[in-house]
A protein has these predicted regions:
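AAA+ P-loop NTPase catalytic core and its hallmark functional loops
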Residues: 1-212, 217-220
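Terminal-proximal interaction/regulatory segments of ATP-powered molecular machines
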Residues: 300-515
Length: 515
């Protein structure tokens, strides 16, 4: 099973386990809600899919790496309590609440979400003293004498023994009480995630050329060499930040993330060439519609990997513009929705308060503060992905700027105050239109270059396919259109259908002994 399918299964399970009947009881009793056990190699993305699943299901998430805990923190600390049994006073040992269970209640209190996912990582790598506690947790859904609260779905994760020397096998009794999912690395599925997360284009194009280098764990005389999906993503974040700071990444730095000598050397060499192609071909000039004649001449002698790298660079430049347009859209939409609520609030202002100086700015400021508080609450609950969080933060920043403008205007009545805000929104709308026009112009310029340089070659197929697979590009084109994209995509689909029909025909002929 790949990680995408596992995520879907987790989401479906959460919805099924939290579904309620007509009486408000959980449709599947807690005793029949089997914990999910994810088994897969390290760095494959198990923790990240838990965050995504919780966010998409609208529930809280408490995540623990159990190898960081002792028996005392998992079970609780012992203390002596006096009891009377059969008329005789005795001292008995009880336990404080487990730190993990306490964290669940703390999360409920902080977020207001009463249902969620309790995720325990590396569950089969615990120490000998903690192993019985983990078995009890999976079998009985308790830590010590404290049960996991109702409405919390248990998901655990572990590594197969070939990846971790500390692994302890579960017995059949335990395995018969869980839902086990075995997860394997899958580059095409990971690339779907990488596109949506805007991972560095050099990494995506490199793995397109060298898919075998996506995930490897090799043991030799010098120790274990490895490269994982987590390593590529963390390296991507660093490369993007280095570029924004004008810093250069070298092989020594890459080895800190890609801990496989041969692959690190290979990617470092590719990254140097990638930057060289960006400068030699003038990617920004191409997207501005000013491609140099020398670029076309250089492509005539270029090998396929160089041509593919150039296509990746063009797509990266477009992706940046699509993302900027999407952010501008999201902020404008957020401000528009806020202004609709503001208009209602202005209309409902009591007459006696409407006479106070700057009352409109004060009301607007209070509403903005409420918006910021709501954003923080959703952020704490993990209900906002990165684009949604960025949009809300930028919206709040914009609203604070409007508040200052409203204060300076000292509007005497609601109509005047709202007119000031409407003018501010007009400026914001112009900025959104500018971002959209810039992205559309760059897309047209990219098609101009692709047609002149590659016509209908394999490079054009890659270009159109990547536009189709990119969430940002797909959303932008669906909203704003691009005639040439639709035409090339239509031709590509027709070619695929013809190829599929030919394959079916050949298979049918083979079955009947005609070939």
């Amino acid at each position: 099973m790949n990680i995408k399918r596992a995520k879907e299964e987790i989401e479906h399970t959460v919805r099924a386990y939290l579904a309620k009947d007509a009486l408000g009881e959980y449709a599947i009793p807690a005793i029949r809600q089997r914990p999910i056990l994810l088994m897969g190699p390290p760095g494959i993305g198990k923790t990240q899919v838990m965050e995504q699943a919780a966010r998409e299901c609208g529930v809280a998430l408490v995540a623990y790496t159990i190898t960081h805990h002792t028996r005392q923190s998992a079970v609780g600390l012992p203390f002596i309590r006096q009891r009377n049994y059969g008329g005789r006073d005795v001292s008995v040992t009880e336990y404080t609440m487990s730190e993990i269970i306490a964290s669940v209640y703390a999360k409920m209190e902080a977020t207001g979400l009463k249902e969620g996912i309790l995720f325990i990582d590396e569950i089969n790598c615990v120490s000998e003293t903690l192993a019985p506690t983990m078995l009890q947790f999976l079998q009985c859904k308790t830590f010590g004498n404290q049960a996991v609260p109702a409405g919390w779905v248990i998901v655990a994760a572990g590594n197969p023994p070939e990846y971790n020397k500390s692994v302890r096998d579960f017995d059949i009794v335990t395995l018969d009480r869980v839902r086990r999912m075995d997860i394997e690395p899958d580059l095409p599925v990971w690339k779907d995630y990488a596109r949506a997360a805007h991972l560095h284009s050099a990494i995506l194009s490199y793995l397109e050329l060298h898919p075998q280098n996506f995930y490897q764990i090799n043991a030799d005389v010098d120790g274990t060499q490895f490269v994982t999906a987590r390593g590529w993503e963390d390296l991507s974040n660093l490369l993007n930040t280095y570029e924004s700071l004008g810093l250069q990444a070298d092989e020594e730095l890459i080895r800190q993330y890609i801990q496989h000598q041969k692959i690190a050397e290979d990617f470092a060499a590719y990254l140097d060439l990638y930057y060289k192609y960006r400068d030699d071909y003038g990617v920004e000039d191409i997207l501005a519609g000013k491609a140099a004649p020398a670029a076309f001449a250089q492509l005539l002698q270029a090998p396929f990997d160089e041509r593919l790298s150039l296509v990746s660079l063009l797509l990266s430049g477009l992706e940046t513009r699509f993302a900027a347009s999407r952010r501008a859209d999201a902020v404008a939409d957020g401000c528009y929705a806020f202004l609709k609520e503001t208009k209602k609030a202005f209309a409902g202002m009591p007459a006696e308060l409407a006479q106070e100086p700057n009352c409109w700015a004060q009301l607007f400021g209070q509403m903005t503060a409420d918006y910021e508080a709501e954003t923080q609450k959703k952020r704490t609950a993990g209900l906002l992905d990165k684009p949604a969080l960025e949009a809300r933060l930028q919206t709040a920043k914009t609203l604070r700027g409007w508040e200052k403008t409203l204060l300076r205007a000292a509007a005497p009545d609601a109509d005047t105050a709202f007119k000031v805000l409407r003018e501010q929104f007009g400026t914001l709308s112009e900025a959104r239109d500018t971002a959209q026009q810039r992205a559309s112009a760059a897309l047209e310029a990219a098609f101009d270059f692709m047609e002149q340089a590659f016509a209908e070659s394999q490079e054009m197929v890659v270009f159109v396919t990547e536009l189709t697979l990119s969430p940002a590009a797909h959303a932008f084109i669906a909203e704003n259109g691009c005639e040439r994209y639709f035409q090339y995509n239509k031709d590509l689909l027709l070619d695929h259908r013809k190829a599929a029909l030919n394959q079916e025909l050949e298979a049918e002929q083979r079955r009947h002994g005609m070939l």
